[in-house]
């Protein structure tokens, strides 16, 4: 059974380890000498690590696929400032060698408490049409089960089971504060956008021991898929105001903020502008939190910058640990 997790690997730098990991991705790449090597991303519920198998991988590569759990032996090293696992041996794990829960990252928050908070927010709506629309989703048992479980992304922010619900509840909270600060904002419209903006991810993503995109997700994308889901629910709500329908759909269509970021329309109403920026803020704050946790797990010093964070195009500094009083040296 599993004893060493990704979060533990920093303790074993320049040492050999044997453990089990789930395969998040794999591909054969060319070496400078004309040969090939196998590049893998391995992971468990505590994180992921880039891995390389330079030799003797031909037979092993035919035994497993993305999403499988494998047993590996390799050396923990550091490449470009990040921990990496150089593999010597690899084989697929048998069913009795692992517990699935060890390999699937999941929210640290109570899912039922998150769900109750979301329902409570919807119950407080004064606009009964918007309330009926959102309830048509939350009262759908298939939707509710998927929404409780889905990740918000494959690798970036909230990339764990329950991550989408955690993100939405967090976003609803800061949207509530924004609506209080800007009284001209339509609070119920803003919260409706916050709750529904990413529902297309329930069909865009697939999740298990690894997170990936469905074929429809790759070809269509969660924004368009989310609009389709909203249209289906609106068809069951006769008398729904057409002007509200237009505004709700605009919120979803524009929530990425820019055409080059995947939104077919720019935000053109105050609620859509707020949703775009607050969604981005929540995602970035959680990305930073995850990077600080990874930095610490890999043995990084509290007062130093992290490695380059690709999704934010910069390194980061954790001010909470940077400003923490230093313990006096032991005599």
Segments the model singles out, each with a brief description of its role:
Residues 26-36, 47-102:
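OB-fold single-stranded nucleic acid-binding module
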Residues 39-44, 207:
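Short, acidic/hydrophobic/Gly-rich beta-strand patch recurrent on exposed beta strands
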């Amino acid at each position: 059974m599993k004893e060493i997790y990704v979060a533990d690997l920093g303790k074993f730098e320049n040492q050999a380890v044997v453990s089990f990991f789930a395969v998040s991705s794999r591909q054969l790449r060319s070496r400078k000498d004309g040969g090939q090597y196998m590049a893998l991303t391995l992971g468990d519920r505590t994180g992921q690590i880039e891995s390389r198998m330079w030799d003797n991988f031909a037979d092993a590569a035919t035994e497993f696929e993305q999403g499988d759990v494998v047993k590996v032996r390799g050396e923990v090293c550091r490449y470009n400032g990040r921990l990496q696992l150089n593999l010597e041996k690899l084989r697929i794990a048998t069913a009795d060698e692992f517990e699935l829960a060890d390999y699937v990252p999941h929210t640290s928050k109570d899912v039922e408490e998150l769900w109750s908070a979301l329902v409570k927010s919807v119950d407080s709506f004064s606009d009964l049409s918007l309330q009926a629309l959102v309830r048509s989703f939350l009262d759908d048992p298939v939707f509710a089960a998927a929404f409780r479980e889905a990740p918000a992304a494959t690798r970036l922010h909230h990339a764990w089971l329950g991550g989408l619900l955690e993100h939405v509840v967090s976003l609803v909270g800061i949207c509530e504060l924004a609506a209080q600060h800007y009284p001209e904002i339509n609070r119920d419209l803003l919260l409706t956008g916050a709750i529904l903006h990413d529902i297309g991810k329930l069909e865009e993503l697939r999740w298990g021991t690894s997170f990936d995109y469905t074929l429809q997700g790759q070809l269509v994308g969660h924004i368009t898929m989310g609009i389709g889901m909203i249209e289906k629910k609106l068809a069951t709500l006769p008398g729904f105001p057409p002007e509200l329908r237009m505004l709700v759909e605009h919120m979803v269509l524009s929530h990425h903020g820019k055409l080059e970021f995947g939104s077919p329309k720019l935000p053109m109403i105050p609620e859509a502008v707020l949703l775009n920026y607050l969604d981005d803020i929540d995602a970035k704050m959680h990305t930073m939190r995850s990077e600080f946790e990874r930095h610490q797990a890999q043995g990084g010093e509290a007062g130093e910058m992290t490695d380059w964070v690709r999704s934010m195009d910069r390194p980061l500094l954790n001010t909470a640990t940077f400003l923490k009083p230093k313990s006096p040296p032991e005599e």
